[in-house]
Amino acid sequence: MNSATTMSASVLNYQILKFFPPQKNGFLKSPLIRGKICRFCVSASSNELNKQVIEDPKEETQEKSDGVIVNSTEEEEERSGENSTSTGPSTVLDNKELKKAVLKTASTFAPRASTATKNPAKPGTVLYTVFEVQAYASMLIGGALSFNLIFPSTEPDIWRLMGMWSIWMFTIPSLRARDCSKDEKEALNYLFLLVPLLNVAIPFFLKSFAVVWSADTVAFLGMYAWKLGWLQKER
């Protein structure tokens, strides 16, 4: 009897297993586990989305910062351009101020008329010619004295000293006394201030009257060529 029941039970179990085979991954295929796995996948995907959303603003901020940097560089270039354009008027103002200072200094120390009268030494008059002859004659005589050709001496004396200063004492004042053009007057004003500086500075390096007179002559010709535009006219 027992053997019959055991055989019937085994046959029943075999039929049950035949119709319902055991699932190897039954634990993973249970609805509870499936729900947890789905939740885990959803949470993982949502974290990735959050990371992407967080990373995108960083890229946008970088792009914005790059744009700010570009804009700042453009602003700096514009400012530098404005500064470069603003240097032009400043140099013009500096030149005007320099001319005013030179004119004021020269008019203060150079000989001038005591009263406000018209200059009679106009071009074509006898007085105009006298001033010109006096100016260039004093320059030539001063050169001869500086080179020790007139009143020669072996030692420095008053004649050679006067020859060294002849351009500043006689030539420039005689030319300024004429009714000359504005450019020539400006050149003479510059020379009236430049020649004393040369006469004082050169003897510290070369104690020679001839060298000082030669430097004054070169400065005289160079200033006239610059202010009157001799080189430009030749070109």
UniProtKB/Swiss-Prot annotation:
UniProt transit peptide range: 1-43
Biased composition range(s): Basic and acidic residues: 53-66
Chain intervals for the UniProt region annotation (Disordered): 53-92
GO terms classed as biological process: defense response; hydrogen peroxide biosynthetic process; positive regulation of defense response to oomycetes
Signal peptide: none
InterPro entries xref list: RPH1 (IPR044966)
Cystine residue pairs: none
Lipid bilayer topology: Multi-pass membrane protein
Deleted gene: phenotype: Susceptiblility to the late blight oomycete pathogen P.infestans.
Annotated compartments: Plastid, Chloroplast; Membrane
TM segment ranges: 131-151, 158-178, 188-208, 211-231
Protein's UniProt keywords contain Plastid: yes
Cellular compartments per GO CC: chloroplast; membrane
Keyword flag Secreted: no
Keywords linked to the UniProt accession: Chloroplast, Membrane, Plant defense, Plastid, Transit peptide, Transmembrane, Transmembrane helix
Function: Plays a positive role in the immune response to the oomycetes P.infestans, including induced oxidative burst and enhanced expression of defense-related genes.
Name of the featured protein: Protein RESISTANCE TO PHYTOPHTHORA 1, chloroplastic
Source organism per UniProt: Solanum tuberosum
Name of the encoding gene: RPH1
